[in-house]
Amino acid sequence: MRKFSLVAVTIGVLFALPAAAQVPPAPAAPDAPTRVRGTIEKFDGETLTVKSREGPQVTIGLAPNFTVVGVAKRSLGDIKAGDYVASISVKGTDGTLHALEIHIFPEEMRRTGEGQRPHDLIPNSLMTNATVSGITAAPQGHMLKVTDKGGEAEVIVGPDTPIVTYVPGDASLLKPGAAIFCIAQKKADGSLTAARITAEKDGVKPPM
């Protein structure tokens, strides 16, 4: 396993949500990215066995130079204008985005995945990677104004919205019972491989 490098990390974004909000992922084509969320059952140095969020056990082969990153809690007060963030959100009836979680990117990761796209955290969720242009009070918490190459968006962040950043980790985090998230590649034979694992650290679970 090579050492963690913030520059190398890419986020597919993103604490487990209530069971009612969980939906099975769409079948992935061979070599297509497959998001895996769950709890570690076993790690032997080369293979990770996970009880997935959807229920079935999943086995993930790890690349020889795989990396591990952890997450650390942050608060709304840690977000400032100019920060590059990822928000996973859903649209309210008024069309405004309501954040399910916010990730603060390290400066080295600015522009990672910039833009807005569908996400699979819950049905109809969106992921927006953008630069914070302003923060104002709102009836339901605070509103982040964010700007990306496609324009500007407003995201409501409630008082209970998980906010995290990424911190260095290593294989010692891959222990039974720890929560993980990864984006694995599905091979033609159905097996999964991954080069990066985001793992629970100091009790903070990946909110992806």
Question: Which residue ranges define each predicted feature?
Answer:
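Repetitive helical segments and hydrophobic/amphipathic motifs
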Residues: 11-12, 133
